């Protein structure tokens, strides 16, 4: 998708070329399930849809296949850590999105992106069970990076913490990450990880790269994301996804036996 979160015709056509070549196509995102629903029909998706970076997997009818929640006893401490870096905090639970500051940074943009509005609450004290994702939000990108590093330091392997955008820090269950999604799909479809191609542009895509034979970074990705990938395509404003499918994925698929 473009910087303005628009699904282009070239990207849609590229996915349909994958279908025609009998290449399975799946999507994973930090978005909630409802925030990915608008992609199902245009992309003719029939594979599991991995929302919240793998925190919830749903089918095309939005029925839950699998769900992984943040340990309830860590929800409060993670929120406190985010606040210590002056991040606004969003909480996702099931299909719902909660905020305490409806006029906070990026709330309106996120509502436009996911096509639904958040529920406004005074605090999150009563919402510690079944939390799929916590998001720290700030336009201070250094604060996002430092909060991510501190989350790794404080919580270790008990959560996954990674930036899904320069201004978003996503915290999820330790197995709710895009690496888990790649492993899950490999098992589901009896594939070797070497047969999987992944395309991404954010730090939360790096774990996914590690579990695929062909990893492709978008041209708009940060340098560390590009270094983690085997190939680099054009930017999302210059049809980088469609070019990656044409230049890398389809030729690799044609070389597969059978």
Walk through the language-model features, giving the residues of each.
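Phosphate- and divalent-cation-binding pockets in alpha/beta enzyme and binding domains
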Residues: 35-38, 146, 181, 207-208, ...
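Active-site phosphate-binding/coordination module
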Residues: 4, 9-107
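A generic structural signal for well-ordered alpha-helical segments
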Residues: 18, 82, 152-154, 225
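Short, structured coil segments at secondary-structure junctions
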Residues: 43-45, 52-53, 60, 155-157, ...
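Residue-level signal for inorganic ion chemistry
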Residues: 18, 29, 53, 134, ...
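Conserved acidic, metal-coordinating active-site core of Asp-based
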Residues: 85-211, 220
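Asp-based, Mg2+/Mn2+-dependent phosphohydrolase catalytic module
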Residues: 211, 216-258
């Amino acid at each position: 998708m473009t910087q303005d979160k628009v699904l282009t015709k070239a990207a849609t056509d590229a996915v349909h070329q994958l279908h025609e070549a009998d290449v399975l196509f799946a999507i994973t995102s930090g978005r909630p399930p409802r925030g990915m629903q608008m992609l199902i029909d245009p992309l003719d998706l029939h594979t599991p849809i991995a929302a919240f970076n793998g925190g919830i997997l749903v089918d095309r009818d939005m029925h839950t296949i699998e769900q992984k929640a943040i340990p309830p006893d860590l929800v409060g401490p993670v929120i406190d850590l985010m606040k210590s870096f002056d991040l606004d905090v969003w909480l996702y639970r099931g299909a719902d999105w909660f905020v305490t500051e409806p006029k906070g940074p990026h709330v309106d943009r996120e509502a436009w992106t996911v096509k639904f509005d958040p529920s406004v609450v005074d605090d999150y004290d009563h919402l510690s069970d079944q939390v799929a994702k916590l998001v720290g939000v700030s336009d201070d990108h250094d604060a996002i990076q430092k909060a991510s590093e501190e989350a790794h330091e404080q919580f270790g392997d008990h959560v996954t913490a990674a930036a899904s955008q320069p201004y978003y820090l996503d915290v999820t269950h330790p197995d709710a990450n895009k690496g888990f999604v790649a492993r899950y799909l490999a098992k589901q479809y009896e594939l070797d990880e070497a047969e999987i191609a992944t395309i991404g542009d954010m730090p939360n895509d790096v774990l996914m790269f590690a579990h695929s034979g062909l990893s492709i970074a978008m041209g708009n990705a940060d340098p560390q994301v590009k270094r983690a990938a085997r190939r680099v395509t054009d930017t999302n404003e210059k049809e980088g996804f469609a070019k990656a499918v044409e230049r890398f994925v389809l030729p690799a698929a044609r070389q597969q036996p059978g």
